[in-house]
């Protein structure tokens, strides 16, 4: 029974540690705070993607 508790704690630890490595920019507001703009398709050539604005299809882009 103790093994189950240990595995459960380990599972939650892995989940919480993994969430810190995702992209931090996920809204229009945070994109603009990081000096980015939202692009519907892909980022223009002079910009690079730094996150998403409303979900996977809308990208947050910033100058290189």
Swiss-Prot record:
It is found in: Secreted; Membrane. It holds the Pfam family Defensin_beta. The keyword Cell cycle does not apply. Its main location: secreted. One of its GO terms (cellular component) is membrane. Keywords: Antibiotic, Antimicrobial, Defensin, Disulfide bond, Membrane, Secreted, Signal. One of its GO terms (molecular function) is CCR6 chemokine receptor binding. SUPFAM superfamilies: Defensin-like (SSF57392). Belongs to the beta-defensin family. Has bactericidal activity. May act as a ligand for C-C chemokine receptor CCR6. Positively regulates the sperm motility and bactericidal activity in a CCR6-dependent manner. Binds to CCR6 and triggers Ca2+ mobilization in the sperm which is important for its motility. This is Beta-defensin 1.
